[in-house]
Amino acid sequence: MTVTGIIAEFNPFHNGHKYLLETAEGLKIIAMSGNFMQRGEPALIDKWIRSEMALKNGADIVVELPFFVSVQSADYFAQGAIDILCQLGIQQLAFGTENVIDYQKLIKVYEKKSKQMTAYLSTLEDTLSYPQKTQKMWEIFAGVKFSGQTPNHILGLSYAKASAGKHIQLCPIKRQGAAYHSKDKNHLLASASAIRQHLNDWDFISHSVPNAGLLINNPHMSWDHYFSFLKYQILNHSDLTSIFQVNDELASRIKKAIKVSQNIDHLVDTVATKRYTKARVRRILIYILVNAKEPTLPKGIHILGFTSKGQAHLKKLKKSRPLITRIGAETWDEMTQKADSIYQLGHQDIPEQSFGRIPIIIKKERLN
């Protein structure tokens, strides 16, 4: 049986994700972000609810990306996720993209020219952000063009880079429905951005989100729930440069900006520059919120849930892979578990996110 990996956030899970799962082949293993997202924000709903939605709509196994994989720039996000999926035996990686191109060719380009491509990055001006530098790199070495508004396409290039030398087949699937950033409600396949924008429109949500009750009936989280915590952390921290990726310049800008900022958007707009993108600033603010220091990654793979078919696959792996199905007295990943505790502080109705939780099991096989 073909084993297909998918890297996802499902923030939240919607019809476009269901389409991706239905289109992908074989047994589907999802490497999913935890309670904080790659672009630097809290998950709309917690990781367990998102896992359940995925498992009820085509996924066979959902594993958690550790905090220091989830909340990273595209290259590190892709590398960490693919490393985990390879341990779980995937043969191919399926992903949605705005531009279906020959990603397999890009893997070969990077395999042959990785040293030259990396060296080229170091020659570019420091005034450029890292995403801008990598886009120029791909344009020069592979002739790839960018519109600047295609985040899934950019992630696809990071997947190609991370897949070099791993013998993985990349399977791009054309993104259907609304564009990534679209807030338009007039689409059967509405974007996650539109869903987050219109959570109070039950008719829209019920048509856009499979198992919509799981979304509607659980706490909806955003930066608003954590901004006061963040402000406290910034104002009371003696040395912000001890936080991951915070240099002297950023520490000074953040300390100054927090005194006049009333919300996260104002703070990000004030701190961001051409060099420090808004996404990077948001990630750094997450690092400050959870007091993240030097990154370490766990050896074990945390299983969030599985179907009967997924369980059979995991049984084949458990003797040779460090699979974690319950976090008890021994920690799985200290940083992820600390981040979970802070996420839980945002709302009194969010249940325990780590200790004692066992995987969600969907025993009934899907009919499709």
UniProtKB/Swiss-Prot annotation:
GO MF annotations in UniProt: ATP binding; ligase activity, forming carbon-nitrogen bonds; tRNA binding
Alphabetical list of Gene3D superfamilies matching this protein: HUPs
Keyword Transcription regulation among record annotations: no
Intracellular or extracellular location(s): Cytoplasm
Catalyzed reactions per annotation: cytidine(34) in elongator tRNA(Met) + acetate + ATP = N(4)-acetylcytidine(34) in elongator tRNA(Met) + AMP + diphosphate
Family (UniProt): Belongs to the TmcAL family.
GO BP term, example: tRNA modification
Lineage per the UniProt record: Bacteria, Bacillati, Bacillota, Bacilli, Lactobacillales
One GO CC term on file: cytoplasm
Keywords: ATP-binding, Cytoplasm, Ligase, Nucleotide-binding, RNA-binding, tRNA processing, tRNA-binding
Protein name: tRNA(Met) cytidine acetate ligase
NCBIfam families given in the database record: PRK13670.1
Pfam families: HIGH_NTase1
Positions annotated to bind ATP: 7-20, 96, 152, 175
EC number(s) recorded for this UniProt protein: 6.3.4.-
Function: Catalyzes the formation of N(4)-acetylcytidine (ac(4)C) at the wobble position of elongator tRNA(Met), using acetate and ATP as substrates. First activates an acetate ion to form acetyladenylate (Ac-AMP) and then transfers the acetyl group to tRNA to form ac(4)C34.
